[in-house]
Amino acid sequence: MNHFELTYKPFGERSILVEWPSKIDESILSDVLRFKEILQKEHIKEKVHIKSAYNSLLIIYNHTIENIYDKISVLKRLYLEESRVNKRVLRRWMVPVCYDDIFGIDLDELTKEFQLSKSEIIELHSKSNYTVFFIGFLPGFLYLGGLDERLHFPRKETPRLKVAKGAVAIGGKQTGVYPNESPGGWNIIGNSPINFFDVSKEVPCFAQSGDRISFYQVSKKEYDNIKALVEAGVYQIESEVIDG
């Protein structure tokens, strides 16, 4: 098991921020999620809210922390213990994407920047297996690591006021899908017809941190057919269990 050099710092009167090395890395993400599970089990009788990101955990207690150093000492001990954590059940989700011009509104610009054809960009984007590193800034927005280096491109200096629901986009070293219509500054290359956040479901977002996402290309006709199934409430996204 990898142990990293962590930093622990107070974050307001009721929270502690735990930080790993500042980089996007699957081994760090795995360690973050492992420690999160340990803390959730340790505090099962205490109402503690734990938020995870790429390389950090924010631990929010239900009371003011009286002695921050005692709390941090406990956290350090728990982290270093070889705790028995059940293997997490992770899944790979197969997500359909239509890259037609009607959806991929930034593809023309990216072909010039990358010196690649549209078909080459689509192939590079759809052949990678992505890891869900973080879910935010909108509910159901999956920040995905694993984008081919040839497709890395900065976000727009001036964000669009309106990005369509399902827009598949590139921002820096990552790719992601806008779960709902919203402002956004990522570069849009396609659209997925499925729901990434559905409040009518017991679990609104089908994916969790650590899961994998594989995109596959569909035609506009296939896109419309899938969208009709989604709207009818009968579409089932394909997935498979992978090692956690």
Q: Which residues make up each language-model segment?
A:
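Glycine-rich active-site loops that engage anionic ligands at enzyme catalytic sites
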Residues: M1-G244
